[in-house]
């Protein structure tokens, strides 16, 4: 396993995901309202509209699909063949996406440039304060949910896709 390649690929995947998420949330915070803490969602004057939910689903499919595609193609191109090394490579990819999300979106964007991402009608919600944001979503999501559940699951899916492609389309080594 090429650790440097896995790290660089993870950084590229993080740039794809976080750049896209930041652009979308700055364009219209309501498009990603379902990713906000429940207290902010409930404080919003109205729930997500059908259009906002549709944009959210399209964004999720395209961006997450693009990240998975990037990870799969890079892993295939890197010539990795065993379950363990493919899984570890995928885990590195997705854990970097996770921590970049935490530092770039939760810490930088949401805490330093809060005015850009506030959902209209929730401006005075105390959850936007750094301490509350980290307690409600930042720490639980990025230091518990993602490292122990989401990243292993995403890594398993990516590993399965890579191994299936290798089995079906690549000659035995």
For each of these PLM feature ranges, what is it?
Residues 2-20, 85-103:
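Alpha-helical transmembrane segments
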Residues 157-173:
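Juxtamembrane boundary at the C-terminal end of a transmembrane helix
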């Amino acid at each position: 396993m090429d650790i440097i390649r896995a790290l660089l690929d993870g950084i590229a995947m993080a740039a794809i995901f976080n750049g896209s998420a930041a652009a979308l949330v700055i364009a219209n915070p309501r498009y990603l309202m379902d990713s906000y803490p429940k207290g902010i969602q409930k404080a919003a004057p109205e729930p997500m509209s059908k259009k906002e939910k549709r944009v959210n689903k399209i964004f999720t499919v395209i961006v997450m699909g693009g990240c998975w595609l990037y990870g799969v193609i890079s892993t295939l191109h890197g010539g990795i063949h065993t379950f363990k090394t493919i899984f570890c490579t995928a885990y590195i990819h997705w854990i970097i996406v996770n921590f970049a999300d935490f530092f770039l979106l939760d810490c930088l964007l949401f805490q330093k440039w809060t005015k850009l991402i506030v959902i209209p009608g929730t401006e005075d919600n105390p959850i936007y304060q750094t301490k509350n944001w980290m307690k409600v979503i930042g720490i639980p999501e990025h230091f518990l949910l993602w490292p122990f559940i989401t990243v292993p699951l995403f890594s398993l899916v990516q590993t399965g896709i890579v191994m299936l492609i290798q089995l079906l389309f690549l000659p035995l080594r």
